[in-house]
């Protein structure tokens, strides 16, 4: 089961107040419902591929409106061939849609979220929970990027969801997609806040556990890569220094170097594996800092380059 499916399953087991049940059900019907007329009767089909969500819708309708509800199961014939669950409401359809502020008394469609549904903060959370159950998805935190989104068919509702989320300081953004619109979050901290808002506390803890391990692993990898790069740089510099010292020795002899450079050249040639700090401790006449040793080695490199360029050197 995917992380998103586990999150939704957890949400379908939450207990709610009556006002919150209405807010959640409104989002579910608005986003997953469709209307049909048969034998002069209006019916509502609420469709989902998640059995737990279908049970949730069925229970909320029975509990809130005491109506006859049918539950149908069909098999998709394309792609994954998953089961499709259809919760069918064949009585009081018009009254329920009006009560959930999805249609007006004249049966015209309401595209925004009614403020009456989300007056209380708990109802705002519940509407977002219903919207996530109906059209939401969230990436597994083990993947390369963090992403949570809620899909809506029309812009007004999508903008209303975005506004509702940003009322909780989530910094959500909207984007037009093929056949609809999405409100999305990209920051891991905002995704965990959203999971907390809608009541997915177990999913939140799992998300955070995986994220912490992942971020720690990435930090270790960055540290190792940095140390490896520094080590390669140090080894490369040491090999270059040794090669230049050998070139000077074979071309004109180390005696051509000033005494201080000659001593460093001989130490670097004889002790190729030691660090600059250790070289500084070997110098006669007192300890020299790493920067001091590095300065002398750069002078030796410059002399080697001058010799390669054909210049004649005289010991100073």
From Swiss-Prot:
SUPFAM superfamilies: Homing endonucleases
BP GO terms, sorted: cell division; regulation of sporulation
GO molecular function: DNA binding
Presence of keyword NAD: no
Superkingdom of the organism of origin: Bacteria
Ranges annotated as DNA-binding: 275-309
Keywords, ordered alphabetically: Cell cycle, Cell division, DNA-binding
Family as reported in the entry's similarity comment: Belongs to the WhiA family.
PANTHER family: CELL DIVISION PROTEIN WHIA-RELATED (PTHR37307:SF1)
Function: Involved in cell division and chromosome segregation.
Protein name: Probable cell division protein WhiA
Gene transcribed to yield this protein: whiA
């Amino acid at each position: 089961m995917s992380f998103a499916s586990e999150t939704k399953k957890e949400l379908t087991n939450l207990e709610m107040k009556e006002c919150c049940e209405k807010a959640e059900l409104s989002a579910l019907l608005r986003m997953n419902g469709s209307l049909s007329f048969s034998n002069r009767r209006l019916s509502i089909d609420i469709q989902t591929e998640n059995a737990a969500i279908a049970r949730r819708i069925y229970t909320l309708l029975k509990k809130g409106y005491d109506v006859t509800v049918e539950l149908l199961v069909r098999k998709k014939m394309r792609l994954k061939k998953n089961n499709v669950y259809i919760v069918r409401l064949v009585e009081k359809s018009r009254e329920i849609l009006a009560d959930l502020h999805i249609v007006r008394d004249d049966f015209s469609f309401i595209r925004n979220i009614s403020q009456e549904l989300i007056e209380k903060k708990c109802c705002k959370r519940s509407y977002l929970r219903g919207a996530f159950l109906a059209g939401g998805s969230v990436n597994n935190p083990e993947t390369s990027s963090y992403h949570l989104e809620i899909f809506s068919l029309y812009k007004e509702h999508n903008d209303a969801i975005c506004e509702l989320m940003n009322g909780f300081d989530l910094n959500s953004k909207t984007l037009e997609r093929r056949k609809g619109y999405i409100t999305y979050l990209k920051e891991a901290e905002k995704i965990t806040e959203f999971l907390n808002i809608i009541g997915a506390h177990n999913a939140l803890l799992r998300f955070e556990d995986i994220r912490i391990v992942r971020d720690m692993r990435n930090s270790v990898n960055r540290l190792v890569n940095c140390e490896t790069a520094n080590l390669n740089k140090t080894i490369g510099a040491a090999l270059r220094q040794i090669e230049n010292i050998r070139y000077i020795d074979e071309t004109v002899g180390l005696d051509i170097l000033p005494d201080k450079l000659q001593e460093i050249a001989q130490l670097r040639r004889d002790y190729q594996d030691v660090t600059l700090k250790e070289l500084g401790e070997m110098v006669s006449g007192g300890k020299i800092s790493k920067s001091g040793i590095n300065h002398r080695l750069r002078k030796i490199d410059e002399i080697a380059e001058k010799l390669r360029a054909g210049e004649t050197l005289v010991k100073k």
